[in-house]
Amino acid sequence: MDTLQQSPPAEPEGGLRRNLKKRHLLMMSLGGTIGTGLFIGIAEPLSNVGPAGTLLAYLFAGTIMLATMMCLGELSCAFPHSGSFQHYALMFMPSPCWSYTIGWLYWFSWVFSLAADLTAAGFIAHQLFPAVPVYMFCLAILLILTAINLTSAKSFGECEYWLSAIKVFAIVLFICAGGVMIYSLMGHSDWHPTLKTDGMWFPHGWEQIVVCMTIVIYSFQGVELVGNAAGETESPHIILPKVILGIGLRIILFYGLAIAVLALVYPHELTPNGQSPFVWVFSHAGIPGADTLMTLVIFSAAVSAANSAIYASSRMLWSMAGDRFAPACFGKTNGGGVPVYAILITALLALVSLLTRYIPAQQFYLYLIASTGQVGCLAWITIGWCQYRFRQSVRNGTYASDLLRYRSPLFPWTARFVIITNFAIMVGTWFSEQGVVIMLVELAFMIGILLSWYLFRPTLSRLRNTVG
């Protein structure tokens, strides 16, 4: 990177094809953040920090997400690549070791997330059809999603578009139902909004919001998929600037309104028992079949998350193969322009979900979620750092200014905000209930990956020649 770098090539390398369109990108990122973390996981913050604290925590996490999206948007418009921040880390981090480490960490986290999502979907389907064991549903869903992803990126995009549309429709319906419920309750003199209860805004103290953030932030992670998809999107430098801000604002709007409804009507003193607060609101709003409706929505959310996991993990492995961080076979594509071997190895490892034949599904799901830990925060920190280094490189003349097709606002404060807040959230995780387990699991993975780097690292001179 000693000479002025010009615009990257218009077409992706390695056989990938630009089959994704703007609507795929928008719905993929929008639906990617609406999952079981919102539908079920929100019960825990509501109980621990109260409705007002939960609303503040989600709005703050949404702000971090929007700032991260802006940083990623600048990088993806300049260098559309399916490896996203892993490839950018190779370009802008002082040592390729971090690109190698975050790439493998992120891939493993998606593989475990895939197994967890398959377990969740299988468990939900088992509740509807008790005669069929959980592991059989896991296998069937995995085979179907693998076949879809092996066809083309467009097939993945269409599948994800409609699965995400179901979730978005459920959120809109929930907001409308909650609005009707609030309007009807306003006529009763004995009704009081639950936003402030027992004379307190924060039942267990405002400091619990910091601990709550460690749960809340994971609900938004996955939105960085837009960076992976940029490498297979038509005219990414034109589409991405239009999509980035729209995605962020829509997510904050949907989350904000949905949580505001819960904050006004959902009793915070209810102990989390596995039931979705959304089901509680639908039931009390008088909508028949609310339990079945939300069960189907949560099932589609789990399948959607599994679909995204196959896509994200396979593209990350494809990128690392191109950067000589993984075997070259994972960089090969089929006639549909998809990395076939990367998809197959991801699906093969996800068969760990079949262990639900021997381990209770709910317990196994928690094990897998704990294994993913803080990788999402590390990915967001990497995005903020790379955007900061890229903008500095443009200023000192290393890269041409015409690469700034989209400018992240408030530089350098946006990047600094992303880095500092995500680091603080990682530290806050240590004080959560599962913090020690998460920290130890992630530390073990990181040490193992770092050891493999020093044992099998490629020739750096050859590696550097592939970047730019």
Please report, for each region that a protein language model flagged, where it lies by residue.
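Membrane-interface "cap" regions at the ends of multi-pass membrane proteins
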Residues: M1-A43, S47-A52, L66, M70, ...
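TM-loop-TM module centered on a large, flexible mid-protein loop between adjacent transmembrane helices
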Residues: H87-S95, Q127, V243-A309, A326-T372
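Membrane-interface loop-to-helix entry segments
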Residues: G122, Y135-D190, Q221, I244-G248, ...
